[in-house]
């Protein structure tokens, strides 16, 4: 499972700073599309520290939430938070591979926030969701769509042209089209066995005071940059990312640098 491994301090930073400033963008969109009649059994794959499970529980009169994540410190935080949810049962466990140990067709809902951008990872995630969700159950994925973080990709392309770094130039071309489109993501869900596919798309922006502010921000350090690096698939990112930092300082010296995030949430119903 290609997710950033979180140490104890990183898990705490994610919960304190990344969830309220960034993951809520995806969680709120997901909650808007969450269908429930009051009772639900939810599996949350890549649950990190357990957001937005408490908000889902607030909508339910009975049921359960099972969360899975590859990072033990994140799971410990999720368990602590889950123990404070009175209305439904919660269970959080560490996992590393698909398929998980959970039983087939055991859940009414399957959710994931900010999954890996790698296509093979998303296909594996959707296949596991299709296995776990019962017929007519709902899957919800909320993720950055095509066009997200394009400002960084453009600056990396500028670096490649300036320093004749052909490998990075090719990587940026791949990265610029790596994130899913509405049409592409719809097809992915349908191929995995889901129907009634609907996608909500909300463009937003993240503001940074400088290149250093961007590079040191927990949102970038823990979620966005590792995802970009994995998409680029280049070994040495230090020099090009230093160029990005300096370019932001130079081009946006008198104004705020805004990074585009196209927040998308896709919903589908498991076909019988």
Task: Place the predicted regions along the sequence by residue.
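Conserved alpha-helix/loop element of class I SAM-dependent methyltransferases that forms part
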Residues: 20-40, 55
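A short glycine-rich, Lys/Arg-flanked "PGG" loop and its adjoining helix->strand segment in the class I
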Residues: 123-138
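Class I SAM-dependent methyltransferase SAM/SAH-binding core
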Residues: 41-100, 124
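A short acidic, Gly/Pro-enriched loop at the edge of an enzyme's catalytic core
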Residues: 98-110
């Amino acid at each position: 499972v290609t997710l950033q491994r979180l140490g104890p301090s990183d898990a705490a930073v994610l919960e304190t700073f990344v969830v309220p400033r960034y993951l809520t963008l995806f969680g709120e969109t997901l909650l808007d599309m969450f269908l429930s009649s009051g009772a639900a059994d939810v599996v949350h794959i890549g649950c990190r520290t357990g957001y937005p499970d408490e908000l889902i529980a607030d909508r339910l009169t009975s049921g359960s939430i099972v969360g899975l994540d590859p990072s033990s410190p994140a799971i410990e935080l999720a368990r602590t938070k889950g123990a404070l949810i009175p209305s439904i049962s919660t269970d959080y466990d560490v996992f590393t591979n698909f398929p998980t140990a959970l039983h087939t067709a055991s859940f009414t809902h399957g959710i994931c926030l900010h999954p890996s951008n790698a296509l093979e990872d998303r296909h594996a995630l959707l296949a596991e969701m299709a296995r776990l969700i019962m017929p007519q159950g709902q899957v919800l994925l909320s993720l950055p769509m095509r066009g997200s973080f394009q400002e960084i990709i453009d600056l990396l392309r500028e670096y490649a042209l300036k320093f004749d770094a052909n490998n990075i130039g090719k990587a940026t071309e791949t990265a610029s089209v790596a994130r899913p489109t509405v049409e592409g993501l719809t097809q992915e869900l349908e191929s995995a066995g889901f129907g009634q596919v609907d996608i909500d798309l909300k463009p937003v922006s993240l503001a940074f005071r400088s290149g250093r502010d961007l590079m040191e921000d927990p949102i970038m350090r823990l979620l966005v940059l590792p995802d970009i690096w994995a998409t680029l698939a280049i070994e040495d990112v230090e020099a090009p990312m230093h160029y990005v930092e300096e370019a932001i300082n130079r081009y946006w010296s008198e104004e705020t640098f805004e990074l585009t995030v196209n927040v998308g949430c896709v919903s589908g119903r498991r076909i019988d």
